[in-house]
């Protein structure tokens, strides 16, 4: 959209949401500019079905959509900032429900700031070009977009549900590099002084798969609180760090963010 301000999204009291594709690049249709606050998955039809968002479909009488088997409601694949915005609304609602469970409350400005700080940057993906298609009155048009045009124009980055819940719950967040090779991560700091001894790191199968973690051992202590691991996927996951001090086991859940 050439960076044009789109209202009501551009109003200062509104959270303006852009859309990113499954490879963290801008969806070809996304709004962008210094007024965009954050982004969320919006799909990109150029990538095929697997690159879109599985969404609910309402009665065809209002949506103009008819399933081949006669159903009036169901699910289908879509793209759009209309896919990205529900991600943000849902995560925001999830966070408020969790805060209420913990007995916490926020002003509008406080919660807005919390959302904005519960994001991960996609700036490193905003380089090179990508192929795209868009619809016109003349049909489908092939085009190429320069991803660098979107740098610093997609807000704080992509809203991360796990980071939001961690920030609300006071769970430590530790960042690591995702290089595909061994990296050293100071997980011991999550345990204070106890973490300077040998630490054990417990990783669920879900976390291992999500971040592509390998090359670590869950049964041996890592000295000085430094965990060595290989990571192939960016994202975030929950791991548990523990240490045995004087016969007492201390542990702390940590949100591990791979970038």
Regions found by a protein language model. Name each.
Residues 1-57, 111-120:
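Catalytic-core segments of hydrolase enzymes
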Residues 5, 14, 26, 85-92, ...:
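Extracytoplasmic/secreted envelope proteins and their assembly/folding machinery
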Residues 20, 29, 38, 76, ...:
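Short glycine- and Lys/Arg-enriched binding-loop motifs that mark or flank ligand-binding interfaces
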Residues 43-149:
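Hydrolase catalytic cores
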Residues 80-82, 155, 160, 193:
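Residue-level detector of functionally special positions within alpha-helical transmembrane segments
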Residues 150, 158-175:
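Secreted peptidase-domain scaffold signal
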Residues 170-259:
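Extracytoplasmic soluble-region selector
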């Amino acid at each position: 959209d050439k960076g044009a301000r789109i209202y009501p999204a551009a109003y200062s009291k509104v959270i303006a949401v852009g859309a990113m594709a499954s490879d963290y690049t801008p969806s070809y249709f996304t709004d962008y500019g210094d007024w965009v606050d954050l982004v969320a998955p919006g799909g990109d039809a150029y990538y095929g079905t697997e690159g879109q968002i599985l969404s609910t479909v309402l009665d065809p009488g209002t949506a103009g959509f008819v399933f081949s088997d006669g159903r009036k409601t169901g699910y289908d694949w879509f793209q759009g900032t209309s896919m990205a915005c529900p991600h943000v609304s849902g995560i925001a609602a999830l966070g408020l429900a969790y805060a209420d469970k913990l007995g916490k409350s926020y002003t509008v400005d406080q919660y807005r700031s919390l959302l904005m700080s519960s994001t991960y940057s996609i700036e490193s993906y905003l380089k090179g070009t990508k192929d795209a298609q868009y619809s016109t009155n003349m049909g489908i048009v092939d085009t190429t977009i320069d991803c660098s045009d979107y740098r610093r124009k997609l807000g704080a980055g992509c809203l991360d549900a796990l980071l939001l819940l961690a920030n609300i719950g006071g769970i430590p967040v530790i960042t690591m590099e995702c290089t595909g090779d061994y990296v050293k991560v100071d997980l011991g700091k999550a345990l204070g002084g106890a973490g300077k001894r040998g630490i054990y790191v417990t990783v669920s199968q879900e976390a291992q798969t999500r971040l592509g973690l390998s090359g670590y051992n869950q049964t041996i202590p890592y000295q000085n609180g430094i965990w060595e691991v290989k990571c192939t996927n960016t994202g975030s996951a929950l791991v548990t760090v523990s240490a045995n001090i004087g016969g007492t086991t201390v542990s702390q859940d940590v949100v591990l963010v791979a970038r």
